[in-house]
A protein has these predicted regions:
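Core catalytic lobe of class I
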Residues: 1-170
Length: 170
């Protein structure tokens, strides 16, 4: 029922971004594997799951699952909103891909691409945000993390629906 309603209202190439931990995250991904595209990992400054510390690891990370109403391919890139925080231009990545990164068959020519790796300014999949000190609820998400995600997946003046709003951080 959740996916039926979300599919009814999502715009073409729109994103649905949901938080979770295992095993719930796996169930959520598999409940709509056709729209699931990738995860972010939220690395927290404080561990959760403190009441189970004797029998399980304390959780310092949380999954942020991204579901897209569209195809995630380079050809569809102009249609998908993804406002990343790249510090360097796409020109560098194009140079790497053309000159040093890959051959026509998609295989790497050699290890020369490694000098650029991690130096592009593009984000990796780990987002580091501290838990807000003045939160209302123990699972409340940091305002700065939510701002980052909203800016990443929407353009100015677009509508955002938070159907899991909990304490209303968004």
């Amino acid at each position: 029922l959740m996916w039926e309603q979300l599919n009814r209202i999502i715009k073409p190439n729109g994103a649905i971004v949901l938080f979770g931990s295992e095993p719930f995250s796996s169930h959520l991904r598999m409940s709509n594997i056709s729209m699931y595209k990738y995860d972010w990992i939220w690395h927290k400054n404080k561990s959760g799951n403190v009441f189970l510390y004797k029998i399980s690891p304390m959780k310092r990370t949380e999954n942020i699952m991204v579901f897209l109403n569209g195809v995630l391919t380079p050809q569809n890139e102009p249609n998908i909103t993804f406002n990343h925080n790249a510090k360097k231009s796409d020109k560098l990545m194009k140079t790497v891909m053309k000159n040093e990164g890959v051959q026509n068959n998609g295989k790497r020519k050699d290890d020369s691409y490694k000098k650029y790796y991690g130096n592009t300014g593009y984000e990796d999949n780990v987002l580091r945000y501290d838990v807000d000190k003045n939160r209302i609820h123990p699972t409340q998400k940091p305002i700065e993390l939510l701002k980052h995600l909203v800016k990443m997946y929407t353009n100015e003046n677009e509508t955002v629906l938070d159907f899991t709003m909990g304490s209303g951080t968004t």
